[in-house]
Regions:
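An acidic-aromatic pocket/loop used at catalytic or ligand-binding sites
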Residues: 106, 145-146
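A short beta-turn/loop motif at secondary-structure boundaries
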Residues: 79-85, 124-126
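Short, low-complexity, Pro/Ser/Thr/Gly-rich segments in the mature regions of secreted, periplasmic
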Residues: 138-145
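Acidic-and-aromatic substrate-binding clefts and catalytic sites of carbohydrate-active enzymes
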Residues: 49-54, 80-83
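Bacterial N-terminal signal peptides that target proteins for export
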Residues: 1-12, 21
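Short, structured motif recognition centered on aromatic/hydrophobic residues
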Residues: 38-43, 54, 88-94, 134
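Short acidic-aromatic low-complexity motifs
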Residues: 45-51, 97
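An amphipathic, aromatic/His-enriched active-site/gating alpha helix that lines ligand/cofactor pockets
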Residues: 7, 18-35, 56-74, 94-136
Length: 146
């Protein structure tokens, strides 16, 4: 129940943040607003003390690989408080379709340079406590981002 409420809260916050981001910074949100897209909300749970390493990997490497594979980020968030604020990273990516998402993730995961980065980032211990969770979202007819 707590996890479900957290996800609902995060999804609501992300939609609101997307709206605000679209008003303040039209790129890449405007691109993501193209009709027919599907949105993927990914939640990463880091091992205790490893959230800074996960964020560094995203900041320093992952975003570049996303760009390489035409994966546009909408935004990244961590919970504002509570125990999950120390271990959780949430972000949203738009995709033209689920099939495109699957193809992009396959290319991303198979990239030898990404594999080196992922391995190097974990020399001091495994970063993730579990596999990332992925939820695909369809925009509502009244959503400012579609």
């Amino acid at each position: 129940m707590r996890t479900a409420l957290f996800r609902i809260s995060v999804a609501t916050a992300l939609v609101a943040a997307g709206y605000v981001a679209g008003r303040l910074t039209p790129e890449p949100v405007a691109e993501a607003a193209q009709a027919g897209r599907i949105f993927e909300m990914r939640t990463y749970t880091a091992n205790e003390g490893k959230l800074p390493a996960l964020q560094a990997r995203f900041r320093d490497h992952t975003l570049g690989f996303f760009k390489k594979y035409d994966m546009t980020s909408i935004g990244y968030w961590v919970p504002a408080d509570g125990p999950t604020s120390q271990t959780t990273l949430v972000y949203i990516l738009p995709h033209p379709s689920r099939e495109a998402a699957k193809a992009n993730w396959a290319k991303f995961g198979a990239d030898p340079e990404w594999q080196k980065v992922a391995a190097a980032s974990q020399v001091d211990g495994k970063i993730l406590a579990k596999s990332p969770e992925s939820v695909f979202l369809n925009a509502t007819d009244y959503s400012p981002i579609k």
